[in-house]
Amino acid sequence: ADPLLSRLKWIAEPWDIGAGGYQLGAFPPGWREWNDQYRDTLRSWWLLGQGDRGGFAHRFAASSGQFHHDGRGPLASVNFICAHDGFTLRDLVSHEHRHNAANGEHNHDGHPHNASWNCGVEGDTTDPAVLALRHRLQRALLATLLLSQGTPMLLAGDEIGHSQQGNNNAYCQDNATTRLAWPAADAALLACTRRLLALRRRHPALRQACWLTGSSDTGAAATVRWLEPDGSP
């Protein structure tokens, strides 16, 4: 093995423009890949009320349909809700439309479809019911991300409720839009994130290197059971 390259972590953003540019799941063993299908499924489930439990479970268990081949394990799936482009987590529950006028492109830049929900009010609000709903959805998305099988990727600032005021293409904003304001951090959201990370570290079952199975052709016991809220199968 190469003395330098063998010690590196290889992570792909597995898509590009043009024919054949989308290559999710096609990288060889040793690589980990951003999983945009995880992102889209989780956003649709929590924010749009779309999708089914089977699809949710498939992503929650590290997307075996994309990565369970050639000896690849569940850690190959880099799960994320938000990334460097697109809405931040707070903006994801606060805006249904991009607000990119400050970028100087007449609000034509940035993706127009974000699978977001503003909880009834576009942008900032003082309505306590809307704020409570937004906070609950952020916690739900963070909990799903940090308790899923696979490799979690958390956008810097999402743990403190950072907002870009609806700008979903802030690459050119070297100012308060993108700078993290720690003195204004959402302390409750940060505490929640810390507890979730501690839980993930404490329990190896939440970060397994082997695939979960609901049944086994070999007669071995299943490694996971999916139950209703009341505990029934």
Predicted regions located by residue number:
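Conserved alpha/beta catalytic core and glycan-binding cleft of carbohydrate-active enzymes
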Residues: D2-A156, I160, N169-Q173, R207, ...
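Glycan-recognition and catalytic regions of carbohydrate-active enzymes
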Residues: L131, Q138-G166, T177-R179, P183-P233
